């Protein structure tokens, strides 16, 4: 049985941990779950079968933390495990790989006094919202947004740069590509590149005008 003051808020809440690759999301998820386990809070941890980087029943963080997990293909499988094991806390890693049904599952758990902590990428390699994450952030009581360090300049990195033969991946590549340092690097906004990103003509004209204005300023400065 969980210790009396193990949960500091009313039972039935959602906490989301998000950010780019290499930001420590899984490490933070494991840390939080283990912290509650020290107070005898019963937990279950799930991860998508899509993610093949870890062993079948283990989640590994890049900092060496490990925790047991249940690999599932569909979000609704969580219900069966919860009914069987009756946890007070559910953790879900790599939540971006599930379809939108995960939002209903998370909401249902929280509505029924089960606390939920999820971790996942908030943006795909294009820098755009990833899968169900925007909806999850919208229903969460708490959001922890982590950053990594840009591999180009050392600034705060909020994006995951996909690399193919050490070159930025084209916008039209498949959204999901399971990989690690061989395929991805953390980047800040200004060093994140996505070739062939669709852009509106008005935006093109605006950017062209900005560049022309900047070039004129530089030219004038050189004359002065």
Swiss-Prot record:
Record EC number: 2.7.1.21
SUPFAM superfamilies, alphabetized: Glucocorticoid receptor-like (DNA-binding domain) (SSF57716), P-loop containing nucleoside triphosphate hydrolases (SSF52540)
Positions of ATP binding: 19-26, 93-96
Binding site for Zn(2+): 150, 153, 188, 191
One of the protein's GO biological processes: DNA biosynthetic process
Domain of life, source organism: Bacteria
Catalysed reaction equations from the record: thymidine + ATP = dTMP + ADP + H(+)
Residue numbers annotated as active site: 94
InterPro entries: P-loop_NTPase, Thymidine_kinase, Thymidine_kinase_CS
Assembly and interaction partners: Homotetramer.
PANTHER family noted in UniProt: THYMIDINE KINASE (PTHR11441), THYMIDINE KINASE, CYTOSOLIC (PTHR11441:SF0)
Protein name: Thymidine kinase
Name of the gene this protein is made from: tdk
């Amino acid at each position: 049985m969980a210790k009396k003051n193990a949960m500091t808020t009313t039972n039935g809440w959602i906490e989301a941990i998000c950010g780019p690759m290499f930001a420590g999301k899984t490490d933070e998820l494991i840390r939080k779950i283990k912290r509650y386990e020290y107070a005898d809070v019963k937990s279950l941890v799930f991860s998508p079968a899509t993610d093949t980087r870890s062993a079948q029943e283990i989640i590994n963080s890049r900092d060496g933390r490990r925790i047991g997990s249940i690999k599932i293909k569909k979000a609704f499988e969580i219900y069966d495990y919860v009914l069987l094991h009756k946890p007070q806390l559910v953790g879900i890693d790599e939540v971006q790989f599930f379809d939108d049904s995960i939002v209903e599952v998370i909401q249902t758990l929280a509505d029924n006094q089960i606390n939920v902590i999820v971790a996942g990428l908030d943006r795909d390699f294009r820098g755009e919202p990833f899968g169900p994450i925007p909806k999850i952030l919208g229903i969460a009581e708490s959001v922890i947004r982590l950053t990594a360090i840009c591999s180009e300049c050392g600034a705060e990195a909020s994006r995951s740069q996909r690399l193919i033969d050490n070159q930025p991946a084209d916008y039209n590549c498949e959204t999901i590509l399971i990989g690690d340092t061989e395929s991805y690097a953390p980047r800040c906004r200004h060093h994140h590149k996505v070739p062939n990103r669709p852009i509106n003509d008005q935006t093109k004209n605006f950017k062209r005008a900005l560049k022309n204005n900047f070039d004129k300023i530089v030219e004038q400065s050189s004359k002065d």
